[in-house]
C-alpha cells in the first residue's frame, strides 16, 4: 500500500529544518516546541517528527492516528522502540547525521584544554563507543598520529589501528571521550556504565601518573551516574561536558565545579541539522511507497561558505598551526560563557531549551578548503590529515 505524504497531517518539532527534500513531502504541517508535544497535540496527526527532548512511547502514541514517527537525531534513547513496534507504527532516525560535528567539537576541545600537544606527543586517547561518532573520531585521531584505545563490545569487524581493550583499561587512559549509544539492552547495557566505582578507578589511574586527565562527554549524559561525575569533579581531572546526568537540569554546584560546559550542542552544526531532515525525508519517501523505512545514510550536506582566508597563519610550525586552527573554530569558550551567564544557581529545563534555541550553529570545516598564503609542506600535510583541503596563493598566479 502506498500513501501520499502531502495528503497527511504532520507535526514537526520547531527546530527541525524544513530542507527542500523534506518540504517537498510536507502536507498540512503543525510546528511546535518539542516539550509541548503531547498526546492531545498528536491525536489527529499522521506523521510525527521530533528531536531528542520528546519522549516517544505508548503513553504519547496510544489512541492517536500516527502512522510514521521519526527523530532527526542520531540517538534513539528517547524512543520506546518496543512500544512503537507493538503499536504497528513505522519509525526512523538519522544515525550519523551529527557525527562530523561531534568529531570537530572533540578535536577543538583537545585544543581548548591544552591536551592537544600531549596526545600528539604520545598520550593515548581512550574512546568509549566506536559507532558513527566514535569510529570517525578514532579514524581522524589516528590520521593525526594519535594512539587510540577503545571499548565497544558491539563493533565487528574491529577498525584497523585502534587498540582494543576492556572498559576498565580504556578508563585508565589520560584522555577519555564518551560516544556510546544509550540503551538498556542486555548484555551490554550502557546506562550508567560509568558508575562511582569506575570513576574512582579513573582517579586512581590519574594519581599514578604525572599530570591530570581529560574527560569529555559529548555523547549522552546518562552514560555515567551522577555519583561518578561528582567523583571526577572533585579530582584533578579536567571535565568537559556537552551532556550530563539529569540533563536538561543542571545543579549549581555541578556548574561551579565543571571546567568546561556547553548545552548539548556538539552535534548541532548547520549541516548536521540539515542531514537529519534529509535522512527523514528519504525514510518517509520509502515508507510512503511501500518500502522499508529504515534510517538512511547521511546525505551530502548543502553548500556552505568556503574557509579560504580563515587559516593563513604559516609563520609557525605545523603543530602550532593545528592548535590555532582548532582554537579559531572552537565554540566551547562561547558556549561555556553563555551557560554561566544564565546564573551560577544552575539551569532549569527552560533555561536549557533557551540556550539551545539561540545557539549560533557553526558550519563544519571538514572537507572544506583553506588558503595558505605560502604553501608549507608540513602544514599542508597536517591540514590534510585533520580533514581539510589546502590551496595556496601561488596556485592562483
Where are these regions (language model features)?
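N-terminal glycine-/charge-rich "phosphate-binding" loop or analogous flexible N-terminal tail
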Residues: 1-45
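Glycine-rich adenosine-cofactor-binding loop
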Residues: 14, 95, 103, 121-142
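Rossmann-like adenosine-cofactor binding region
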Residues: 56-57, 155-252
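Rossmann-like dinucleotide-binding domain for NAD(H)/NADP(H)
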Residues: 205, 212-390
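NAD(P)-binding Rossmann-fold cofactor-contacting core
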Residues: 143-160
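Phosphate-coordination loops involved in phosphoryl transfer and adenosine-cofactor binding
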Residues: 7, 121-124, 196, 212
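A short, aliphatic-rich alpha-helical micro-motif
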Residues: 42-43, 61-63, 169-173, 255
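Phosphate/diphosphate ligand-binding glycine-rich loop within oxidoreductases
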Residues: 46-118
